């Protein structure tokens, strides 16, 4: 199975190698020289220069191979900290001082350990703490990488913005240069063979324009220089900040790993001797490249630490492989969740737009509902006014009927008047007969108690007045006495009043029927609740028109009632007037 173990790479100016070579040749990558006599002394004066920590793949040795481990350290040319740790192959020595080149070197370990110690137990609770620390370190490293990516993206965007501004400024500079050249050409044309006052003024204007253009060009150059300097500063800051952040995170993770492994006795038991320096200076002792004094990496390189069993190494490797898979799955899940969040934000934006539209429609519906409520309130008020008008018209009709009933005794009075006119034509001897009906109540008037309708009253008036009118027209004689004139005027007035009463009664009865029908229809419409807004508006318009027409029709009802009352008063005063001429005669 593929196993992965966390290793530390210490990067400095050189990469040193530790361990005994297989052929007995002393390796130049040893860190501490061996003391004579086989006695080892602890390493002293080792200076640390830590750069970064990265995660590397480790391949376990085959079952048929001896315990000669080979440590292969590589560094990419892009200054990244990702390397492969090959423990199964040997590679030739190579070292370099440049940080942008690849460094590699073999590192061998002796097979049997110097002092075997008890391997760590699988059930040790510190393994869980170690794995949790590794997991938290991986999460923090992932967070730092994510933050660095975001900052790099922002800086790149800012750099692109500055580049676009620089390009715009360069275009403006080129344009100003062309304008200056054109102005110089125009100025040279103006300085022709006839330099008069106008030409000199134009030359001065052109000179001022050229000076202004030069000033603007200088300002643009200064701005461009400032922008370029700012761009370089941002790039330098980005390049300086990224390694520092990675170095701090990886150093913290390495310290936790070393602390966890040192508790299990994996530290070095014997110091390690160094070997010759780099190829450039063979006499100078090599400087350790940030190796910890009690770290796991030094124990492995020196080969003096206890060897772990195959099963424990496989467990640790499988656990770290699972951690790596979990980190990758977490990263993939984070990207998926980010996409889901973006989609949710887009959906929320669309929902917000729809909600704004719905709120606008709801406000319009509320305004329309308020208008409908006001219209219904006005309709109720007008219906109440219509009911009061109908009541007034009913009262007017009742008074008119009472007045018409009071006109019942008109027929005997007219007959008596006709007889008196005939007697007045016969001679003055019959004048005294007119006083007789005035002395007491008329027997016909006393016996006449029945009620006459409007049609019968009209017929009686026509039969009573027609012979008198015909006789007056035929003779063409003016009445001789004042009593005849008064009687004639009273007859004409009674005829006009009777006709007016009849017409008014017919109009009032028809108007009353219409008003009752419209009132019933208005009440039915008001009782109808389940109506659409459009139907309510149409119904309100229709009711408004109908109410206006009814108001116009019923506006004359109080006037007609008062007229009827006046007519009744005049009619009630007719019998006393009838006795007046008799007394005068």
Swiss-Prot record:
Positions of modified residues (Phosphoserine): 224, 281, 309
Entries under InterPro entries matching the protein: TSKS
Domain of life, source organism: Eukaryota
One Pfam family, short name: TSKS
Segments passing through the bilayer: none
Compositional bias per record (Low complexity), positions renumbered to this chain: 91-108
Record region (Disordered): 91-126, 262-309, 559-585
UniProt KW Nucleus keyword: no
GO molecular function: protein kinase binding
Post-translational modifications: Phosphorylated on serine residue(s) by STK22A/TSSK1 and STK22B/TSSK2.
Keyword Cytoplasm: yes
GO cellular component: centriole; cytoplasm
Keyword list, A-Z: Cytoplasm, Cytoskeleton, Phosphoprotein
Subcellular location: Cytoplasm, Cytoskeleton, Microtubule organizing center, Centrosome, Centriole
Main location (coarse class): cytoplasm
Role: May play a role in testicular physiology, most probably in the process of spermatogenesis or spermatid development.
PANTHER family, A to Z: TESTIS-SPECIFIC SERINE KINASE SUBSTRATE
Protein name (Swiss-Prot/TrEMBL): Testis-specific serine kinase substrate
Native organism: Rattus norvegicus (Rat)
